[in-house]
Amino acid sequence: MQFVLHKTASGVTRARRGTVHLNHGDVQTPAFMPVGTYGTVKGMLPRDIEAIGADIILGNTFHLWLRPGTDIIDKFGGLHKFMHWDKPILTDSGGFQVFSLGAMRKITEEGVTFKSPIDGAKVFLSPEKSMQIQYSLNSDIVMQFDECTPYPATHDEAKKSLELSLRWGQRCVDEHKKLGSTNALFGIIQGSMYADLRKQSLEGLLEIGFDGYAIGGLSVGEPKEEMIDVLDYIANDMPADKPRYLMGVGKPEDLVEGVRRGVDMFDCVMPTRNARNGHYFVTGDVDNAGVVRIRNSQYRTDEGPLDPECDCYTCQNFSRAYLSHLNKCKEMLGAQLATIHNLRYYQRLMQGIRDAIEQDKFDEFVTEFYSKRGQTVPELNLR
């Protein structure tokens, strides 16, 4: 992997424009990665994902390991051929999914024992096993196995958790090298909401050495102000010559705020999940902060496109009234068209950000973004 930093925005922001060169292609940053949990972005054919402009998608190590299993994916030479996607893939390590199991799991120094959510069977996942699974998947970016610190956590709990993740991180690097993988391996910064612990985690990861660094343990129930606070004091301390990835955070305004603080990569289920629930992101809707809730009665007879500024297949061919009808009838096509639009909205947002950075107009872009949503630009408190 190679990361090329092309430009840093002028002004007070830390926005960056770059390219991540990976085994299956290049990723233009800042980038948003659609989530394909089971080897599919819900409701999207691979050609649809390419058409909306995505350079990279995310797969889920935990779920793909349990079903269909790496024995089957191995027969295809990895996840790319299995799902007919020839561009880059990032896979998470399974750490967040294990965290979400709650009482169904037991964490030790060696790894995590848990009951399979599929059949209740006892399963063990370790740093080494996570690396082996991701090696079989042949993902372009492999994530270290970590413990996602719950929120809220005491300082002592967060410290013990991050130190366990650091020890696991070293084991991940050792196993990654042992396997002879040529794919990139990213470390994950933990430490809950504590500035000193986030710094300790980052310093520990830098000592181990990774190809890129991610900010984990956010979007787990904390107030948005605390999430932004973490970004304010940790993002700029991350190496400038490596990609910076904010995990699982994905409201449009969160992406903009992350970029303002120097983040390069994002992922979230929000655009696809919200699409299935009738919430569509649009460029300009002052009254509704950039969201059309298609189930509202006002759209039943609306002949206009979902978003007049959008170039996606949905907006170019269908009315809000038709989308309202499909949603009301729970038609499969409705969810598919909504997903196409929401993911295209996210890719257009990131393209606009990249163009603005290149043209030294990022501050103007941010002002216009919030203005179209009827919001004021949040204050930057960089440290």
UniProtKB/Swiss-Prot annotation:
Positions of the UniProt region annotated as RNA binding: 248-254, 272-276
Molecular functions (GO terms): metal ion binding; tRNA-guanosine(34) queuine transglycosylase activity
Active site: D92 (proton acceptor), D267 (nucleophile)
Keyword terms, alphabetized: Glycosyltransferase, Metal-binding, Queuosine biosynthesis, Transferase, tRNA processing, Zinc
UniProt cross-references to SUPFAM superfamilies, sorted A to Z: tRNA-guanine transglycosylase
Catalyzed reaction equations: 7-aminomethyl-7-carbaguanine + guanosine(34) in tRNA = 7-aminomethyl-7-carbaguanosine(34) in tRNA + guanine
GO BP, sorted A to Z: queuosine biosynthetic process; tRNA wobble guanine modification; tRNA-guanine transglycosylation
EC code(s) of this entry: 2.4.2.29
Group of enzyme by EC: transferase
Quaternary structure and partners: Homodimer. Within each dimer, one monomer is responsible for RNA recognition and catalysis, while the other monomer binds to the replacement base PreQ1.
Entry's family note: Belongs to the queuine tRNA-ribosyltransferase family.
Name of this protein: Queuine tRNA-ribosyltransferase
Native source organism of the sequence: Psychrobacter arcticus (strain DSM 17307 / VKM B-2377 / 273-4)
